[in-house]
Amino acid sequence: MEMSALEAAYKNPIASLFVVYGRRRVGKTTLLAEFCKGKHALYYLATEESIQANCAAFREMAADFLQDELLRSAANAGWEMIFKTLLAQPSEEKLVIIIDEFQYLGKADKAFPSVFQKIWDTQLKNENVEVILCGSLVHMMMEQTLSYSSPLYGRRTGQIKLKQIPYAYYNQFFPAMSEQERILYYAVTGGVPKYIELFHQGKEIYDDILQNVFTPQSFLYEEPEFLLRHEVNDIGSYFSIIRSVAAGNCRVSDIAVSLSIPVTSLPKSLKTLCDLDILEREVPPTEKNVETSKKGQYRIRDNFIAFWFRFVYPMRSFIESGHAEIAMNKLRSGFIPNHVGYVYEDICRSKMWELNAQGKLPFLFDRVGRWWGGKDTEIDIVAVDTNDRSNILFGECKFHQNTQMQLSELRQLKAKAAAVQWGKESRTEYFILFCISGYSEELHRLAESDPHIILG
């Protein structure tokens, strides 16, 4: 989909300005390298050096690209002159210009987005060119290119926020594994290409975790710190918030109490963590106004971050003192119930959207998610059509490794459904069940005879 968007812009005869952004390791550079194949493309990777050093490096890159020794020797040539020279080169092909890690230029010189805006307005926008600004510091990229206050606001013709690879594609990376095994790997790697590459060795999951995460010298041991340190200034306070959420404090008030800080100090930090796709705010799908609902809860959205804060961060003293086996024992006892089970619920909710689009469910819904309320009642899946209160679908997800789902679990789901008041007067209730180990014969017979029961 992302490649199609870039290709469509390339084939369009008018100029385009694309913003591509997303957290580190998700494959932005690989995407752009693939896109550039066979094209008249200039790729420049910005650095954290001064704006003058970057300009000189960009001039060298452009001189190599054009084979222009005059440009190379023009030590005083600024950004505008370099772009003017690039555009003056005759070519039947569309010119592609990519500036990767664009945010470093704005960090080195706060005026650079304004400089680039002028270059776009006076030179680029009327030429046969596709410009792609790419960056991995999400918050900074949003400020410099997408926010209303940015000089580039309104100039972009498209944007791509590159995210992790969905679970549905994991069979391409681990084709020899069973679905149960693939889910275990997804629960740790979370769709990040670099992490998948590290774990793609065909070992047993716990051996892979020990080698790649539970060893102080391993690539992923300090990964969350590395990711956050580049995005925020006060990494300690952000770590505390994530740790609190990982411990089960999901409401803003609970997070504040656990950290002994005022509630009013949290909204900005929570928004930043949501912008980074580390946290997300959940609201029961039956709520009338999602944005203003007081039932909002926060959860860790990133599988690896959730895994790390549950199993690595609390055990670092053991790991660093040479007793990783203690941390591994804790992992073995808690990995499935305290982590994989929740990841499996996410997978099932994603599958709900696929089934919905394919017309394989009793009605078309526009909201699906986890529901909570009543006296500590929680339902894994509730799906509704907000414009029609006559139907509602309830779902249960179980990652039983060796046990089939039983009729008793359907009965429990039906009992919990009674706590949901949405459309209760005249609604038709449907129930969908997901279980990684399958279903009992009783459930199969019931699903065959009752159209209100669906086995996912």
Task: Briefly describe each language-model feature range.
Residues T292-G456:
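A cross-kingdom feature that marks ATP-driven nucleic-acid transaction machinery
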